[in-house]
Amino acid sequence: MTIGDLIKNKDYDYVSYRLTLPGGDDTFAGCFASKGGEIIPLDGDIYDKDEEVISYEEWSQPEDDIQNGLTVVVKGEWIGG
């Protein structure tokens, strides 16, 4: 499943974009909204609709005006030192 698959039929006020870490955890790496299957960056970054999603969760946070929230976790590409 890709980010595009998740957003093609539902609009999200806020998508938390997270990357996996080498130890198995994940970390926040950016955010965007979606409308009509398109990504709308909220932080100026560029996101790829074709990126494979490892896991996801829908949520809401009405106190922050987020009715349709989504967290996606994608594979982090890390360069070893």
Residue spans of the language-model regions?
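Short, structural beta-strand-to-alpha-helix junction motif
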Residues: 1-2
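Acidic, low-complexity, intrinsically disordered interaction modules
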Residues: 17-81
